[in-house]
């Protein structure tokens, strides 16, 4: 079984189907990224005592004792081993699709748009790590970057990085 962040669950399911892995995937609400102290309890509840692999990077959560994805952030599984780039706000397909709900409303910017510049003042650009590029997602990525007041760069990454990391966890 894989307990996955909702931001990764669709990708995990698609990879499992493509690879023929018979694995149940249970998703945990992605909004918990805004409240990382609640992630462990949600993972434990979803796991229900079963032996699980956790499709979360660190994400600010204490997931000690679980086999999980390496790295500090889920975008690292799509970005690969590239160095962190100061000033970059990373977007994944999930964040592009759900930007208004998860980021804009999730951070209260719908009620207090004046906070945008405080929250994002240290960012110089948005980078969309595109797993599956479509015209609809292109438009949504442009919308997200515009709301942040940042120029957009697109890097087509696919999901191979996530697939390699899942394989290491599930097939070891």
Language model features with spans:
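Structural motif
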Residues: 4-7, 29, 56-58, 129-133
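Hydrophobic/aromatic-rich structural module bridging two neighboring secondary-structure elements via a short loop
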Residues: 46-76
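Long, charge-dense
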Residues: 64-105
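Active-site glycine-rich loop that binds ribose-phosphate moieties when present
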Residues: 41, 104-116
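Glycine-rich, highly charged phosphate/nucleotide-binding loops
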Residues: 36-48
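Extended, histidine- and acidic-residue-enriched regions that form the cofactor-binding/catalytic faces
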Residues: 113-172
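N-terminal basic/disordered segments at the start of proteins
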Residues: 1-19
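A short beta-strand-loop structural module common to alpha/beta enzyme folds
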Residues: 21-38, 154-156
